[in-house]
Amino acid sequence: MYSRSELLLLLAVASVLTGCVTTPPYVYHYIPGRTATLENGYAVAPPTAPLPVTEAIDAGNELIGKPYRYGGGHKNYYDTAYDCSGAVSYVLHSIGRMNTPTPSKELRDYAQSGPGTWITVYASRGHAFLVVAGLRFDTGYGGREHGPQWLTRSRPADEFVMRHPYGL
């Protein structure tokens, strides 16, 4: 049996150790042949990308120009407007990696933990975005909401967990 002071010390050490884990910010790094590029707001897959990655980029491109709407893409994958997790769900569904539109906080438990080789889901309790072949697919940051778009602009991710589809 542990004494009260030993238990408090263990609790303090555990809280410090778990508090040290933070998700690094998203920062775009171009790697020739491995990173997607942008042309007029649309993503172009790198030549070495596997088929599911190319399909994910194509699916994200289908949503470019759609407006933002809270709850958009949740009743049906095919909607007239999308919120963050609706857009993420649409892309993952298009590559056969999601069966039901999923809210941001539930994406925190999606598939495998950690960053993916090609696709990473960043999820917090209130927002989600994707990074596909190095490009960020997002609906908002900095107090502004907009429809789904591909971005190279950096953003903090300290409130997010990183998850990825199996094998990607």
Label for each model-derived stretch:
Residues 1-8:
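Bacterial N-terminal signal peptides that target proteins for export
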Residues 2, 16-67, 143-168:
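Intrinsically disordered, low-complexity
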Residues 8-18:
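Bacterial N-terminal signal peptides
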Residues 13, 62, 90-93:
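Residues within well-ordered alpha-helical secondary structure of globular protein domains
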Residues 42, 71-76, 105-110:
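Short linear capping/connector segments at secondary-structure termini
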Residues 49, 57, 89, 93-168:
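...with weaker cross-activation on analogous glycine-rich loops/strands in unrelated enzymes
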Residues 61-81:
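Active-site nucleophile-His-acid catalytic modules used for acyl/amide transfer and hydrolysis
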Residues 76-95:
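Active-site nucleophilic cysteine motif
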